From Swiss-Prot:
The keyword Transport does not apply. This is Bone morphogenetic protein receptor type-1B. One of its GO terms (cellular component) is dendrite. Residues 149-502 are cytoplasmic. It is a single-pass type I membrane protein. Interacts with high affinity with GDF5; positively regulates chondrocyte differentiation. Interacts with SCUBE3. Interacts with TSC22D1/TSC-22. Interacts with TGFBR3. The lineage of its organism: Eukaryota, Metazoa, Chordata, Craniata, Vertebrata. On ligand binding, forms a receptor complex consisting of two type II and two type I transmembrane serine/threonine kinases. Type II receptors phosphorylate and activate type I receptors which autophosphorylate, then bind and activate SMAD transcriptional regulators. Receptor for BMP7/OP-1. Receptor for GDF5. Positively regulates chondrocyte differentiation through GDF5 interaction. The gene is Bmpr1b. It comes from the Eukaryota. Disulfide bonds join C32-C53, C34-C38, C47-C71, C81-C95, C96-C102.
Length: 502
């Protein structure tokens, strides 16, 4: 931009002999030539101003130069004459004040084109169109590639475990029972060697999905023809997977009434990580599923109850020896976390929330897990947050409250006098199907209600004793509840009095 007025108004000129002359006085009202910028009161394309005359050249939308001239008021003229370049717009302005119609001698030129300016106008639009088209085609090709790759991956068994690893760690003909018995006789007592676990995990063939929960999925699989259950955890539930694996591999943990652990492994397939927990397979499913479809007699009722509490008793008991077992509390006992074997006995499963007691240091080992137990089965001290988290016996007594509710579920399905109730969850008539903490707190803590007993129980000695037993398990005061060992002994006496061999 050229601002001519400043030099001609303020700086004097010198004659050739060196004498200086005064600057030419500036007209108070300046007349300027106007073109494309003439006010309404202009005459013969002449406008008047107390500021500057200007001439400007700029490109229109088609790229053609357009010349504009006219008057600029005194206020703000300096700013306008010092034209600030605008990106992607070519223009130039020159101003003057030395005489009337001085702007007719101004001939501003467009600034030179920069590299990027050559793509403006029609050529720019054409280039833009080509670029957008090419990018769109590339995007479509990338999406198609990803889609077909995804479909090809989906076509494979989702949880397939490769056979690429060496099988020499496990001799041909060895069964799972053989391997487990060998590991127990070796004296470790903590399950199969990790290398054997990984080999088994890689040789599992997934057959069908048999369950799904908040932690992940359960599949029925096969290893050398033997059926196994494979729990596949979501990656968000890694803490549960780690804790359950850790508990199952605790020394002296194996018990006939605790779900038999086989192997655990982490497998990465590139797009996702799979967390496996492989256990014994029990086709009857959970106690919850079993009770919904099966009615019981006194013997089968006592068998389910006795085997369940035997597993719980083993969990709760600390074993002192050179390779001792710590006391363990389950913290999420419910009928869905107990499985029914072919022989009608139960085993306890899902130890992802279990807590251990380290007696040497008097320390309660709580898992770093955001997951919480099932609200319907929570005891009053958990619901009202009065449970002493640093006292291990608090967790043991919380388990016993939950076990009392499980006894109620079992007893309702026992036939007496030709009568039996349909299966229901505890508190089914008092809270919604998915109760909130507030729902359970009101019923269990404030109103101190418990599941009701059918009238027929009072006329059946076995069911009457079961009712008494569960009442002592779910007492409001944790210190008043029976221990698992006490319940186990009571059920054994009941079976003996009924002449039932467990």
């Amino acid at each position: 931009m050229l601002l001519r007025s400043s030099g001609k108004l303020n700086v004097g000129t010198k004659k050739e002999d060196g004498e200086s002359t005064a600057p030419t006085p500036r007209p108070k009202i300046l007349r300027c030539k106007c073109h494309h910028h003439c006010p309404e009161d202009s005459v013969n394309n002449i406008c008047s101003t107390d500021g500057y005359c200007f001439t400007m050249i700029e490109e229109d939308d088609s790229g053609m130069p357009v010349v504009t001239s006219g008057c600029l008021g005194l206020e703000g003229s300096d700013f306008q004459c010092r034209d600030t370049p605008i990106p992607h717009q070519r223009r130039s302005i020159e101003c003057c004040t030395e005489r009337n119609e001085c702007n007719k001698d101004l001939h501003p030129t467009l600034p030179p084109l920069k590299d990027r300016d050559f793509v403006d106008g029609p050529i720019h639009h054409k280039a833009l169109l080509i670029s957008v088209t090419v990018c769109s085609l590339l995007l479509v090709l990338i999406i198609l590639f990803c889609y077909f790759r995804y479909k090809r991956q989906e076509a494979r068994p989702r949880y397939s475990i490769g056979l690429e690893q060496d099988e020499t760690y496990i001799p041909p003909g060895e069964s799972l029972r053989d391997l487990i018995e060998q590991s127990q006789s070796s004296g470790s007592g903590s399950g199969l060697p990790l290398l054997v676990q990984r080999t088994i995990a890689k040789q599992i063939q997934m057959v069908k999905q048999i369950g799904k929960g908040r932690y992940g999925e359960v599949w029925m699989g096969k290893w050398r023809g033997e059926k196994v259950a494979v729990k596949v955890f979501f990656t968000t539930e890694e803490a549960s997977w780690f804790r359950e694996t850790e508990i199952y591999q605790t020394v002296l943990m194996r018990h006939e009434n605790i779900l038999g652990f086989i192997a655990a492994d982490i497998k990465g397939t590139g797009s996702w990580t799979q967390l496996y927990l492989i256990t014994d397979y029990h086709e009857n499913g959970s106690l919850y599923d079993y009770l919904k479809s099966t009615t019981l007699d006194a013997k089968s009722m006592l068998k389910l109850a006795y085997s369940s509490v035997s597993g719980l008793c083993h969990l709760h008991t600390e074993i002192f020896s050179t390779q001792g077992k710590p006391a363990i509390a389950h913290r999420d006992l419910k009928s869905k976390n107990i499985l029914v074997k072919k022989n009608g006995t139960c085993c306890i499963a899902d130890l992802g929330l279990a807590v251990k007691f380290i007696s040497d240091t008097n320390e309660v080992d709580i898992p770093p897990n955001t997951r919480v137990g099932t609200k319907r089965y929570m005891p009053p001290e958990v619901l009202d947050e009065s449970l002493n988290r640093n006292h291990f016996q608090s967790y043991i007594m919380a388990d016993m409250y939950s076990f009392g509710l499980i006894l109620w579920e079992i007893a309702r399905r026992c036939v007496s006098g030709g009568i039996v109730e349909e299966y229901q969850l505890p508190y089914h008539d008092l809270v919604p199907s998915d109760p909130s903490y507030e729902d359970m707190r009101e019923i269990v803590c404030m109103k101190k209600l418990r599941p009701s007993f059918p009238n027929r129980w009072s006329s059946d000695e076995c069911l009457r004793q079961m009712g008494k037993l569960m009442t002592e398990c779910w007492a409001q005061n944790p210190a008043s509840r029976l221990t698992a060992l006490r319940v186990k002994k009571t059920l054994a006496k009941m079976s003996e009095s009924q002449d039932i061999k467990l």
